[in-house]
Amino acid sequence: MRGVAFAVIGLLAGIGYGSVSAVSAWPLESAAQDPAADARKAAEAIDTSGKPAEAEVAWRKVIATQQARPKPDPETIALAHNRIGDTLYYRGKPDLAQKELEAARDLLAAAGLGEGDMMSETLSNLGTMHTAQGRPASDVELQRKALAMRVKLHGPDDTRLAINYYNLGYALYEFGQPLEAADSIELGTRMRLATMKPDNPDLFLTLATAAGIVESSGRVLTAIEFAQKAVELVNTHHPKHPYAGFVRGVLGKTLTGAGRSAEAIEVTRQAVDELAASMGEENPLTLDAIGNLAVSMARLGRFDEARELTMRSIPKKREERAPDTVRALITASNYAGEGGREAEAIAIAEDGYAFAAKKMPPDHAIRAQVAFVLAIHLERSGQLKRALELMQETAAIFAKREDAESPRRLGADVYLGGLEIANGLRQQGYARVAAAADKMAPKMFAIAQDPALGASNSYYETFARAAEAAIQAGHPGDAFRYHQLASYDVNVLASQQVAMRTAAGRSSEAAALVRDLQDAGRTLRVLNRQKAGLLARGDVEGARRSDASIAETEAKSAQLTGRIEVIAPGFERLSRPEIVPLATLQSRLAKDEGLFVAMPSRSRTSVMLIRRDGVKVAVSAKPRSAIRPLVTAVRQSIDTALNSGETTLPPFDFAASHALYAALFPAEIRSGATGLTRLHLAATDALASLPFAALVTQPVRGTGDRALRDARWLIRDMSLDVTVSMASVGAGGTPISRATAFAGIGAPALTGTPGKPIELAGLFRSGRADVRAVRGLPPLPGAMAELSQMRAALGGERSTLVTGADASEARIKTMDMSQYSVIAFATHGLIANQVDGLEEPALVLTPPNEESVGEDGLLTVSEIAALRLNADWVILSACNTAAGSTQSAPSYTGLAHAFLYAGTRSLLLSHWQVRDDAASRLSVATVRGTASGLDRAQALRQAMLALIADRKVPGGAHPAVWAPFVLIGA
């Protein structure tokens, strides 16, 4: 969490240890008639965070009534000064709050109460005011002193120490010691959670602040636990509290940290609106929420928006929030770099570095972070010596402050080693890289296997940098291993899960149990996402039902694991991630077969060409910020052609296509490709949405039909397929023949106008699919013929067609799909967020006459994943079936991942909306080619080349028509 000083929330206001001794000093028989007692009771009934001005008046009355007594109680007066300090703090006046706390301290000391609970609380709160004014070092000193007092009084485990552990944790966090801070603040938070009433507003504020701090130390699950509990308490007891937006913003931040950015945006936007209304635009909490929204935007690839939001989150009076200012400048610099604004990125980072040097101690963690970011940008601009010095500064600070295996420290070592290599210290640098990267791998795998988190690309950048270093240091085997680690995403995990079922025996009890266990893990991820959305919307009862379902599913998982371990003792070994050694992969490749690896990072793009008899490697100077616009340009020229409605299609962007080819296939790689007839592709980031077949290997003159037909497309040189898992490369797909069991599904009964553009705006009503709108989608006249021709190519004895009114969700879900080795869907494909209300990709089937539970005409990703398949090949002749959620999303997410998980070993998908005549031509020709003995990749290549050459097909030579399909896992 950015450094909004909220350790005091609930700590200044809540525990009231001094009040215990103060009350006991008053005669019980007279307490009811005592004006001082009445004043205190009235003051304690007012929420200091929700109504600070009213609370201040009430607590000043407590002081006045005490001073009117013959013998004023010093502890009660000290307590009142503490509470008044609360009210001033909540109104942004920590300097005035400090004076109140100093008055309390001096009063207690003069009364001989310098070692009691009230003094401990006062010192703790006083220290927090120091941090609020930019003095965290003195805060840490005061917090340790306050904690020592209470330990002496009560021992280290007494719950009355919660305030001290909590405030010490926050002080350590602001002082730049996140790991020790997380230990202390988590202990204090759990103590408070166990002892405080759920309707006490201090509790939800405690949980929210703790969530932000433990998340920054890498404890993602604990952060989500605390944040979700905080939102639940707000929704239940304090929906109109002025800090409700703050709590929601913390939940959004923790969701983003867990790789759940799409969910986080909804929560955080609500937080920004609530905070702006209750606190004002310049309030630190509002600015913090704006910064968190920027992070979520960036995770979805929206870097310009993210940079603008981040700069907006910087306070006008930067000096008053120095740590926050530097953090925001670091973040804005990163976003500028990712958006291709390199000069701006350096300028912002230089500003942050200079500001931190003036305002922060030399060994502060934020100094390390800003030096790290500036070093990366300077390296990219060729300033290697200064970049190395800055990265050495970063590593030295992290080595002093963080655990030896903390992700930040290990990441800094990877980058430091890379810079040492760049500065000529090759052996020393690579030893550092290898040691750090190897320690990070188990951490990444643990997160990927966790049901609440799952595989993501959060470690991508560090392993990509390690791969670059390995290439530069001459270690191609290690570079290949690091590429696999960087690319360990949901599809690799799905392929691994299918392999586990196969190893257990496809028809065995063990395989069924393994599938049930994997389904339970998938269900847990869905339930956790649902819970976050319910909490964001204030649905307390729904969130509680989710909790019950989560607990039930976790118990089921534990039971299944126990049963599997009994009947399949080797299961644990099978469940470990598999990283394929370079030599093993080479041994699987045929002489004319190669694997091409491309990994864009923020600094450069590393590429490898692996053949049976050798490896070629190169590092391109183009970072992903340069690669992404080129991919976008190619895709935009295709989209323009698709949307033109003209017989003669608009020009293809040959310049961008060739620029990409030149960047990805430099001379070193091209020299190794001679004689290849088949190339497996393992490309990440935006390259996953690139139709490699449409790269031109030579510059093209002209833009017309002749230029398109004569262009030297990469597909002319070799067949192409995309690999999901290195374990399957070179293994060879199962050949198909006329005896293959085939299921053709599609040509749904729709009533719209054929050929009319799809109108999506009315598909959903109140968050659910409108079956009438689904039925009104345009039919696909060629789909029936397409499926029939595939069936004819494969033979009819073991084949079936499910079309028209029969092609419904109910039919598909009740079919025994495991008996078909080839399955084809010919229908519309919809991607998530293409229409409001559609939260996941879907295939369109025939909708029911009336809406019913579980059947609305859309076969979604979740429903596809629940199918039990045993297919060698699934063909999705539909729109956008290869689409991921963003440029930076794991490759081929959505429908592809669902079919892989369901039990598919190979897929034919479309990158974009496929013209009906082209879809039929390409898919049928590919199936016919495979039935005649060609491998799938070669069959697809020949189908593409035939379409390019056929002058009878309008626009057939344009990649928009012939290049939509991609073969995955061939």
Show where each model-derived region lies.
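N-terminal leader/linker segments that initiate helical-solenoid repeat arrays
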Residues: 22-64, 68, 75-83
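Residues that mark the junctions of alpha-helical repeat units in TPR/alpha-solenoid scaffolds
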Residues: 35, 70, 77, 112, ...
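Conserved alpha-helical positions within TPR/SEL1-like repeat arrays
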Residues: 40-48, 76-90, 117-132, 159-174, ...
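Amphipathic alpha-helical segments of tetratricopeptide repeats
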Residues: 63-67, 105-110, 147-152, 189-194, ...
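Alpha-helical solenoid repeat scaffolds used for protein-protein interaction
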Residues: 292, 304, 311, 322-323, ...
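Catalytic cores of enzymes
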Residues: 568-970
